[in-house]
C-alpha cells in the first residue's frame, strides 16, 4: 500500500470493482434471510443535494452492515420521475419534460455512483417509463371494477399558478405546498380512490408498527381522524327541506342556539335565490382559500339565511347561518353550534349577538365565566331536561338513544380522512386509463390498450397541457366505436405508492407483480425518508399495500416494518441588501469568515469585500443559496470523508449542521486510520494471537477492542445511533495509535484490532476499508467479510486498576484482582511505596472505597 491516503486514487478503482463484479446484485435465495433496505427515491431535479446524500448514506450503511451479518440484502434505486417541476423547466429551457428528466437522471446517477452507494442498478426504475405506469393504469381499472374508484364533480383545492388540483395534504396554511401560491376553491370533475373504505384498517395497522416513529403514527392517526358521534337531522321550518349535522358532543344538544352551513351547502343556494346580499356573501366565501388548519385562527364571518331549523327535542326555532368556518367537504357541510361549549361557536355568537346557553357545568364546583370564553371540557348536564346531572357518557348514550327512537338521529363513526383525489390537470404524469363513449358512458380502457402512452416529444407553451391542447390525442376507439381518452393525469403520489413493490420484480412483464418475488422480499425491512411525508406518501404507501394484498399480490399487512425519518441538513446562510432593498444571498463557499475564540462568526465578507449578514443555520435551499454541492465535496475530500461526516455530525433523526471544518476533521481521522495500517504493515505480525501469553497491558488493549465491537454492533444494529458508533471507533483509534508494536504479541493484538476497526468502519467508509482490508493480508474482498464479533471472554476483566487518594489527592494506582474485596484492596494500596509516604505516622480517620474504582484514605496527624 502507498504511504499517503489518496481517496482520488482509491475510490474510482473500488467503484469499478463493484460495478464489474455486480457485488450488490440481489437474487432471491430462500436459504438466506432476506433484508430489504429502501431509501425514498428522489425526484430527478438535476443535481443531488446534501439531503439526498444523507438519506442514501444512512440506507447504505444499514445495507452494508446487514450484508456483513450474512443476510441477502436488496437495496434498489430509481426515480420518481413525473411531476410539475419538469414542466416548468421545460418551458424555461425550451425543451420537453421527458428530455429534461432523462438528462437529469443520467447526471444524478453519475453523482450517486461517485458516492459509492451499494445499489442494485439492475433494478433501476423510472416512473415515467410506460413499462412502469402500464401496470399502475391496469391496477386503476381493476380498482374501478371493484367499485373503489369513482368520478364526481367536487369542490377542490385549485392552485391557479400551477393550474392543478391539490389534495388536502398539499395545502399548507392556505397555500400550495410546492409554489406557495394562495389556493382557491373550484368545482371540477375528479377521479377518486376510496381510501376511506380502508380508514379503519389504516388506523388499526398503526398499532402493528412498533418500529415506526411515534410522531409519524400520531400524525397519521390525527389525519385519519376517527371520531364517534351522532348524525342528527333537523327539519327546516316552513319548507320540506332537512339539514343533517354530525356531532361528537350530543351531550351539548340542548345548548344549540344556531346552525352553521357551508357556502356550498344546497340550503345556502336555496336561501340566496331571492337574497342578492346573501348570494354575494356566499360567492365571496366560496372564493376564500380555507384549509382546515386555518379554521381555528381565521376571522369568523357569517350571514343569516332567513331559514330556521326545528330542534328535534325542544321544538325551538334555530336560525341557520352561512358561516365561513364550515367546510362542505368535511362532515355534512353543516354544524350545530353550541356557543357555551365550543370556542369557535362562541366567537361567532358573540360577534353576531346570538344566544349562549349553558348546558354543561364543571364536575367540580369551579366558577366559569361564559361571557369571556366557552367551557369546552366534559362535565355534568344542566338545563337539559331529563338528562340533568348526567356525565358525558351517560348523556351521550341517553340523548343518542332518544334521537334514534324518534328517527332523527343515528350513532355514527366518522373520519376526517377524505377520499384520494388522483386527477391532475397537468401533462407530465401518467394518463388516467378511462374512456368516454359517444353516449357519455365512462368505461375503463381494456388491458390490450394499455399502456395509454404519454407522448414525450412535445412543446410546452406554459398554458395548457399538450395532450389537452392536441384535439387528436384523445381520439380513440373501443370495439370499433369512437371514444375519448381522459386527458387528466395521475397525481404523482400514485407512482410512489407502489414503487417499493415493483423493485422486487422490475423486469416482470406478465403482470403488475411477480407474487413469488414480492412475497420473498416484502415487507421492506428498513424504510428511510423525511418526516414531511408522514400524511401524504407514507399514508398512500400503506393504503396501496392493502390494495395489493386484497388483489392477491402480497401477503403482508404493512409495506415496511421499520421507518427511520432522517433530519434535514442545515448550512450557514449569508446575504447583503441591494440598493433596491432586496436580499442577495451569497453561497457559503464564497464567504470569508472571522470567528471569535469560541468559534462564533463575528464577521463575514463576500469576494467583493462586502460585509454580509449571517442569518444563521437554515435548511439548505436554492432560495437562500446555501446548498453545498456534494460533487464538489467528493472531489475535494473523497466520498468516504463526506459519508463519514454525514453519519458522525448528528444523530440520524436530528438536523445536521454542515460545517466544512467537521468534514476536514473526518478526512484527518481517515488519514490516521490509513497511517496506522501502513505503520503496522511495515512490520506485521508473523504469528497468530496467543491469548494465554498476553501481558496485562495487551489484555487491557484487547478488552477495549472487544468492548468497542460490542458497542458499535449495538449502536448500528439495534439503536441506529451511528454517530456514537463512530465516536467509539475514534476513541479506540486514540488508544491504538499509542499502543506499542515492539513484541510479536503486540503486533498480533494490533492485527486483531485493525481487522476489527476496518470492518466496523466498512459500512460507513467502504472504499478506504476495501483497500485496508487487502493491505491487512485478506485474500477475499471485504464486501464478503463477516461482521466482527465481540469476544465475551476478552471483555471480562480479571484485574482492576484502583486509584488511591489520600485526603482527596491522587497518590497512587494499584492493580488488584477483579473480585478483590475491600480488605485486600486496602492491604495492597497501603503497601504501595508512594501511598505509604502519605499515610505513615498519620492517624487514619476513615477509608472510603468505591468498588472497583477508587480508594480514598482520610488521615490527620
Curated annotation (Swiss-Prot):
<dbReference type="Pfam" id="PF09334">
    <property type="entry name" value="tRNA-synt_1g"/>
</dbReference>
<keyword id="KW-0067">ATP-binding</keyword>
<keyword id="KW-0963">Cytoplasm</keyword>
<dbReference type="Pfam" id="PF13603">
    <property type="entry name" value="tRNA-synt_1_2"/>
</dbReference>
<dbReference type="InterPro" id="IPR009080">
    <property type="entry name" value="tRNAsynth_Ia_anticodon-bd"/>
</dbReference>
<dbReference type="Pfam" id="PF08264">
    <property type="entry name" value="Anticodon_1"/>
</dbReference>
<keyword id="KW-0648">Protein biosynthesis</keyword>
<feature type="binding site">
    <location>
        <position position="622"/>
    </location>
    <ligand>
        <name>ATP</name>
    </ligand>
</feature>
<dbReference type="InterPro" id="IPR002300">
    <property type="entry name" value="aa-tRNA-synth_Ia"/>
</dbReference>
<dbReference type="Pfam" id="PF00133">
    <property type="entry name" value="tRNA-synt_1"/>
</dbReference>
<feature type="short sequence motif" description="'HIGH' region">
    <location>
        <begin position="42"/>
        <end position="52"/>
    </location>
</feature>
<keyword id="KW-0547">Nucleotide-binding</keyword>
<comment type="similarity">
    <text>Belongs to the class-I aminoacyl-tRNA synthetase family.</text>
</comment>
<feature type="short sequence motif" description="'KMSKS' region">
    <location>
        <begin position="619"/>
        <end position="623"/>
    </location>
</feature>
<keyword id="KW-0436">Ligase</keyword>
<keyword id="KW-0030">Aminoacyl-tRNA synthetase</keyword>
<dbReference type="InterPro" id="IPR025709">
    <property type="entry name" value="Leu_tRNA-synth_edit"/>
</dbReference>
<dbReference type="InterPro" id="IPR014729">
    <property type="entry name" value="Rossmann-like_a/b/a_fold"/>
</dbReference>
<dbReference type="GO" id="GO:0006429">
    <property type="term" value="P:leucyl-tRNA aminoacylation"/>
</dbReference>
<dbReference type="InterPro" id="IPR015413">
    <property type="entry name" value="Methionyl/Leucyl_tRNA_Synth"/>
</dbReference>
<dbReference type="GO" id="GO:0005829">
    <property type="term" value="C:cytosol"/>
</dbReference>
<dbReference type="InterPro" id="IPR009008">
    <property type="entry name" value="Val/Leu/Ile-tRNA-synth_edit"/>
</dbReference>
<protein>
    <recommendedName>
        <fullName>Leucine--tRNA ligase</fullName>
        <ecNumber>6.1.1.4</ecNumber>
    </recommendedName>
</protein>
<dbReference type="GO" id="GO:0004823">
    <property type="term" value="F:leucine-tRNA ligase activity"/>
</dbReference>
<dbReference type="GO" id="GO:0005524">
    <property type="term" value="F:ATP binding"/>
</dbReference>
<dbReference type="GO" id="GO:0002161">
    <property type="term" value="F:aminoacyl-tRNA deacylase activity"/>
</dbReference>
<dbReference type="InterPro" id="IPR013155">
    <property type="entry name" value="M/V/L/I-tRNA-synth_anticd-bd"/>
</dbReference>
<dbReference type="InterPro" id="IPR002302">
    <property type="entry name" value="Leu-tRNA-ligase"/>
</dbReference>
<dbReference type="InterPro" id="IPR001412">
    <property type="entry name" value="aa-tRNA-synth_I_CS"/>
</dbReference>
Amino acid at each position: 500500500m502507498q504511504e499517503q491516503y489518496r481517496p482520488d486514487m482509491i475510490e474510482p478503482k473500488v467503484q469499478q470493482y463493484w460495478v464489474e463484479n455486480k457485488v450488490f446484485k440481489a437474487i432471491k435465495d430462500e436459504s438466506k434471510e432476506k433484508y430489504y433496505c429502501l431509501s425514498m427515491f428522489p425526484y430527478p431535479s438535476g443535481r443531488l443535494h446534501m439531503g439526498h446524500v444523507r438519506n442514501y448514506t444512512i440506507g447504505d450503511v444499514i445495507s452494508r452492515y446487514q450484508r456483513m451479518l450474512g443476510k441477502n440484502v436488496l437495496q434498489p434505486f430509481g426515480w420518481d420521475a413525473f411531476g410539475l417541476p419538469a414542466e416548468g423547466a421545460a418551458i424555461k429551457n425550451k425543451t420537453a419534460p421527458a428530455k429534461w428528466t432523462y438528462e437529469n437522471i443520467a447526471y444524478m446517477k453519475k453523482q450517486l455512483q461517485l458516492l459509492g452507494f451499494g445499489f442494485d442498478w439492475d433494478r433501476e426504475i423510472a416512473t415515467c417509463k410506460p413499462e412502469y405506469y402500464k401496470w399502475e393504469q391496469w391496477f386503476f381499472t381493476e380498482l374501478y371494477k371493484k367499485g373503489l374508484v369513482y368520478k364526481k364533480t367536487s369542490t377542490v383545492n385549485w392552485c391557479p399558478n400551477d393550474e392543478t388540483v391539490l389534495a388536502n395534504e398539499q395545502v399548507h396554511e392556505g397555500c400550495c405546498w410546492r409554489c406557495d401560491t394562495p389556493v382557491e376553491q373550484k368545482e371540477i370533475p375528479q377521479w377518486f380512490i376510496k381510501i376511506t373504505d380502508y380508514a379503519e384498517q389504516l388506523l388499526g395497522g398503526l398499532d402493528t408498527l412498533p418500529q415506526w416513529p411515534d410522531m409519524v403514527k400520531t400524525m397519521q392517526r390525527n389525519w385519519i381522524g376517527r371520531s364517534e358521534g351522532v348524525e342528527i337531522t333537523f327539519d327546516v321550518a316552513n319548507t320540506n327541506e332537512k339539514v343533517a349535522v354530525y356531532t361528537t358532543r350530543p351531550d351539548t344538544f340542548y345548548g344549540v342556539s344556531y346552525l352553521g352551513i357551508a357556502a356550498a351547502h344546497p340550503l345556502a343556494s336555496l336561501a340566496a335565490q331571492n337574497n342578492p346580499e346573501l348570494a354575494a356573501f356566499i360567492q365571496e366565501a366560496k372564493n376564500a382559500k380555507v384549509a382546515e388548519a386555518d379554521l381555528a385562527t381565521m376571522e369568523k364571518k357569517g350571514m343569516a339565511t332567513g331559514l330556521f331549523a326545528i330542534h328535534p327535542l325542544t321544538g325551538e326555532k334555530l336560525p341557520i347561518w352561512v358561516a365561513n368556518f364550515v367546510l362542505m367537504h368535511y362532515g355534512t357541510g353543516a354544524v350545530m353550534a353550541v356557543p357555551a361549549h365550543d370556542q369557535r361557536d362562541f366567537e361567532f355568537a358573540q360577534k353576531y349577538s346570538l344566544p349562549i346557553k349553558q348546558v354543561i357545568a364543571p364536575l367540580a364546583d369551579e366558577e366559569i365565566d361564559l361571557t369571556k370564553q366557552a367551557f369546552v371540557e366534559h362535565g355534568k348536564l344542566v338545563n337539559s331536561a331529563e338528562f340533568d346531572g348526567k356525565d358525558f357518557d351517560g348523556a351521550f348514550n341517553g340523548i343518542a338513544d332518544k334521537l334514534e327512537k324518534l328517527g332523527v338521529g343515528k350513532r355514527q363513526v366518522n373520519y376526517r380522512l377524505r377520499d384520494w383525489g388522483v386527477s391532475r390537470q397537468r401533462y407530465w404524469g401518467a394518463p388516467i386509463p378511462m374512456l368516454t363513449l359517444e353516449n357519455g358512458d365512462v368505461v375503463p380502457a381494456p388491458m390490450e390498450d394499455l399502456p395509454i402512452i404519454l407522448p414525450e416529444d412535445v412543446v410546452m407553451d406554459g398554458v395548457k397541457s399538450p395532450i389537452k391542447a392536441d384535439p387528436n390525442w384523445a381520439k380513440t376507439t373501443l370495439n370499433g366505436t369512437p371514444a375519448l381518452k381522459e386527458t387528466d393525469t395521475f397525481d404523482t403520489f400514485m407512482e410512489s405508492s407502489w414503487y417499493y413493490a415493483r423493485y422486487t420484480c422490475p423486469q416482470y412483464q406478465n403482470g403488475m407483480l411477480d407474487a413469488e418475488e414480492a412475497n420473498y422480499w416484502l415487507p421492506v425491512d428498513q424504510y428511510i425518508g423525511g418526516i414531511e411525508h408522514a400524511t401524504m406518501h407514507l399514508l398512500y404507501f400503506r393504503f396501496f399495500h392493502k390494495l395489493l394484498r386484497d388483489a392477491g399480490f402480497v401477503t403482508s399487512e404493512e409495506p415496511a416494518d421499520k421507518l427511520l425519518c432522517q433530519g434535514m441538513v442545515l448550512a450557514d446562510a449569508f446575504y447583503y441588501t441591494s440598493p433596491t432593498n432586496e436580499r442577495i444571498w451569497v453561497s457559503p463557499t464564497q464567504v470569508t469568515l472571522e470567528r471569535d475564540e469560541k468559534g462564533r462568526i463575528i464577521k463575514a465578507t463576500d469576494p467583493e469585500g462586502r460585509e454580509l449578514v449571517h442569518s444563521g443555520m437554515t435548511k439548505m435551499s436554492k432560495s437562500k443559496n446555501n446548498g453545498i454541492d456534494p460533487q464538489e465535496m467528493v472531489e475535494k475530500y473523497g466520498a468516504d470523508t463526506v459519508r463519514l461526516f454525514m453519519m458522525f455530525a448528528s444523530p440520524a433523526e436530528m438536523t445536521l449542521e454542515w460545517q466544512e471544518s467537521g468534514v476536514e476533521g473526518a478526512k484527518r481521522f481517515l488519514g490516521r486510520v490509513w497511517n496506522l495500517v501502513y505503520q503496522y504493515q511495515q512490520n506485521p505480525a508473523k504469528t497468530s494471537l496467543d491469548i494465554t501469553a498476553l501481558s496485562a497491558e495487551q489484555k487491557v488493549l484487547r478488552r477495549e477492542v472487544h468492548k468497542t465491537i460490542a458497542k458499535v454492533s449495538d449502536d448500528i444494529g439495534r439503536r441506529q445511533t451511528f454517530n456514537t458508533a463512530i465516536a467509539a471507533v475514534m476513541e479506540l483509534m486514540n488508544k491504538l495509535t499509542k499502543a506499542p508494536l515492539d513484541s510479536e504479541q503486540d503486533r498480533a493484538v494490533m492485527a486483531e484490532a485493525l481487522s476489527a476497526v476496518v470492518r466496523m468502519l466498512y459500512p460507513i467508509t467502504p472504499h478506504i476499508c476495501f483497500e485496508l482490508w487487502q493491505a491487512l493480508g485478506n485474500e477475499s474482498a471485504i464486501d464478503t467479510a463477516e461482521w466482527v464479533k465481540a469476544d465475551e471472554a476478552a471483555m471480562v476483566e480479571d484485574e482492576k486498576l484502583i486509584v488511591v487518594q489520600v485526603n482527596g489527592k491522587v497518590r497512587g494506582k494499584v492493580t488488584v484482582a477483579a473480585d478483590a474485596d475491600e480488605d485486600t484492596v486496602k492491604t495492597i494500596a497501603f503497601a504501595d511505596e508512594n501511598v505509604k509516604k502519605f499515610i505513615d505516622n498519620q492517624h487514619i480517620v476513615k477509608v472510603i472505597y468505591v468498588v472497583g474504582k477508587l480508594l480514598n484514605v482520610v488521615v490527620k496527624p
